[in-house]
A protein has these predicted regions:
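Catalytic-core "active-site belt" of small-molecule-metabolizing enzymes
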Residues: 2-204, 245, 253-263
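Short alpha-helix capping/helix-loop boundary micro-motifs
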Residues: 31-32, 214-216, 231-233
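Buried hydrophobic packing segments
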Residues: 45, 166, 209-216
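Active-site scaffold segments
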Residues: 106, 209-210, 230-232
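Short, intrinsically disordered, mixed-charge
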Residues: 131-134, 138, 211-221
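Structured functional modules or segments
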Residues: 221, 229-244
């Protein structure tokens, strides 16, 4: 894609995101046709934030999730600082189209991971992580039907990133736990609850974290100290509505909650 095409696609997506509007797909003349094109468009969204990048997310970490949106593998997206909240916050609901909340393991990095020729190992990436947190992602898409547009357009649309809620850091003993078997519960208080387990994200949240680090490395992007990486939903996404109270219980690792504002 040319720089002009990238900018036009970026303008279109940003205007729809901030204006809470939808489109069927990016017009063919400026549509990304590869994952690389999608990431190039996504990168032009970051400077519009006006704040340092908060972190990264991974989408489509399960086979079921990949089939649902018709992609053949995970995708990375950017978490913008102005759309990140602490546990207990009221999160805007607005014109959210997807209307789900997801329970996720999030990691805060304590040192940079600079791109390298070969892949990072799980051990290398986990050593570079400083803390793990229970987290809530409230995704959304700028497309009317995000299940049909394909990976390049989904990546351009920031891999369905929208709002994010970060819980307190878990005790340092998390390093001694097998996160793949760690059980958790997601709840919309008074409405529904679903159980989950760490293995639901690429077999282990630490593997999902490593996938993000290696995806960024392949793109020449530094995963920086202080950035947060959220690793995908460990529960079947919870249906939400304005005014709901969402709570995720990660057992000994703590919990995270938020309330949803009005439309």
């Amino acid at each position: 894609m040319t720089s002009s095409q990238l900018l036009d696609a970026s303008n279109l997506l940003w205007d729809h995101w901030t204006g809470e509007r939808r489109l069927d797909q990016i017009p063919e003349a400026i549509r990304p046709s590869s994952r690389a094109d999608g990431y190039a468009v996504q990168a032009t969204l970051e400077p519009r934030s006006g704040a340092p990048l908060f972190g990264w997310k991974i989408a489509a970490t399960s086979v079921a999730g990949q089939k649902h949106i018709n992609v053949d593998g995970p995708m990375a997206g950017r978490l913008l600082r102005e759309r990140a909240f602490d546990s207990g916050a009221t999160v805007p609901f607005g014109a959210n189209h997807m209307r789900v909340a997801e329970a996720e393991f999030a990691f805060t990095m304590r040192r940079d991971l600079t791109p390298q020729w070969g892949p990072f190992s799980v051990g290398e990436v986990v050593e570079a992580a400083g803390s793990v947190h229970p987290a809530i992602e409230i995704p959304d898409s700028r497309y009317n039907d995000f299940t049909v547009v394909g990976a390049p357009q989904l990546i351009a649309d920031n891999a369905c990133a929208h709002y994010f809620v970060l819980g307190p850091a878990a005790p340092e003993s998390w390093r001694e736990l097998d996160l793949s078997t760690h059980a958790l519960k997601g709840e919309v208080v008074g409405k529904l609850a679903r159980d989950g387990v760490g293995a639901n994200v690429l077999g282990d949240p630490r593997i999902a974290l490593t996938w993000v680090a290696n995806e960024l490395s392949s793109l020449g992007i530094i995963l920086r100290a202080g950035q947060v990486v959220t690793t995908g939903t460990c529960v079947v996404p919870l249906e939400i509505a304005p005014g709901d109270h969402v709570r995720m219980d990660f057992g000994v690792l703590g919990g995270v909650e938020c309330r949803l504002g009005p439309v």
